[in-house]
């Protein structure tokens, strides 16, 4: 079983029924669940003697002190994106899998897929409410029209994907009302 993401993204049902404040709370909760998943599985392999913090740090491409913080539930300095990339490199039965490059590529693919989902919801909302991109950006994302236009123009997703952290995309998904089931579809 490949670890991807402990699914606790409980977006409100309905198109654009969420807000950025609740999205931030949801994201912080998701980080905790992701940390629990990583901590539980990494500690299991450490206790068996299969891994140590140094090996994990080397595999994850980070410092041993960062791994120590993770294993001690200190995740303030971690983003959801980093925790999820780490989770892509852990299998609950096999231990460490996937290289950091493979995990980062999987994250990039997930971010592009999530941008497409958000794009569909934005287009649907623009049409349904007959509002312009600036209004939608201000009202729902606390941002400007240029951000919304980047989601409307799918041709440039590969150009713009680097502008968006996974954390930010998860918050936008929450606001858009993208459900856990929809997120599961692209996170496979």
In which residue ranges do the predicted regions lie?
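DNA-binding alpha-helical recognition surfaces that contact promoter or target DNA
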Residues: 44, 58, 69, 120, ...
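The alpha-helix within a helix-turn-helix
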Residues: 57, 87, 126, 137-138, ...
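Residue-level signal for the short linker/turn that defines the boundary of a DNA-recognition helix
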Residues: 50-52, 78, 131-132, 167
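Central "turn" residue of the DNA-binding helix-turn-helix
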Residues: 50, 61, 91, 130, ...
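The DNA-contacting recognition helix of HTH DNA-binding domains
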Residues: 53, 64-65, 69, 94, ...
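DNA major-groove recognition helix of helix-turn-helix/homeodomain DNA-binding modules
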Residues: 80-95, 163-182
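A short, Lys/Arg-rich alpha-helix, primarily the initiator
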Residues: 20-49, 97, 103-135, 139
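Recognition helix of helix-turn-helix/homeodomain-like DNA-binding domains
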Residues: 60-76, 142-164, 186
């Amino acid at each position: 079983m490949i670890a991807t993401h402990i699914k606790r993204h409980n977006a409100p049902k309905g198109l654009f029924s969420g807000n950025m404040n609740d999205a931030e709370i949801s994201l912080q909760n998701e980080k905790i669940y992701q940390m629990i998943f990583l901590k539980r599985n990494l500690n299991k392999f450490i206790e068996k003697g299969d891994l140590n913090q140094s090996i994990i740090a080397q595999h994850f491409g980070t410092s041993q002190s960062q791994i120590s913080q993770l294993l001690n539930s200190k995740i303030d300095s971690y983003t959801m994106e980093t925790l999820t990339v780490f989770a892509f490199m852990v299998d609950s039965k096999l231990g460490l899998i996937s290289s950091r490059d493979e995990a980062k590529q999987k994250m990039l693919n997930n971010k592009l897929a999530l941008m497409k989902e958000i794009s569909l919801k934005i287009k649907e909302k623009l049409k349904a409410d007959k509002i312009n991109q600036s209004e939608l950006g201000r009202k729902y994302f606390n941002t400007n029209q240029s951000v919304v236009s980047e989601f409307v123009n799918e041709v440039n997703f590969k150009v713009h994907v680097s502008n968006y952290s996974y954390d930010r995309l998860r918050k936008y998904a929450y606001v858009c009302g993208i459900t856990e089931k929809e997120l599961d579809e692209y996170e496979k």
